[in-house]
Amino acid sequence: LVLGPKLYLEDRIRLYSLIWDEVEEFTQLLRTLLNALSSLGYAENAYCPLSALIPRETSIIDVNTLEGVNDPKSAPLDIVTPKGIRTSLPRSVIAALVAELTIVMEEKPAKYFDYTDLLDFPGYRSRYKFDDVRKELKKTGMLKEMFLRGKVAYLFQRYSAENELTSMLLCIGPSNQEVQDLPGVINSWIAVTH
């Protein structure tokens, strides 16, 4: 994978597609996301208007916005990089790319916010264990579900590995949860951070 960044875009996509046995839906998703990053000059940060968050139904932080990630007709949103590169990308693509969102508050409700970041990992679920991924991807919404599970797991692992999570509040609703591997994930976090 060291070779990947040195390759032209399509060659890089072909190389990475070997990881998932060249499943076309995953390859197309990677192509969509890499093209979006390319249009931003591969910037690590970008700015977007408040309309990126409201209304809630189309917010880039609402996991349901990922539904149209491979749909080029998804509602566009204008964004700009710190270097002034401006582009318009589908909200679903921005939702897929965003790892962290910084919201500046005019008035802080408590001093706690001077030294605390709040991270939310929505939709944390157990990973799927499929015998035939291609068959499962034919089901409506399955690409979004697989991407969401992978993204949330990746972000949690990344923040844990970089010791950016120092405290945790675990909220679980009263219904049956589909997170059989959650105890192991929490134990790993405790072992790494404490």
Which sequence ranges carry the predicted segments?
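Globular "head" domains of long coiled-coil molecular machines
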Residues: 1-194
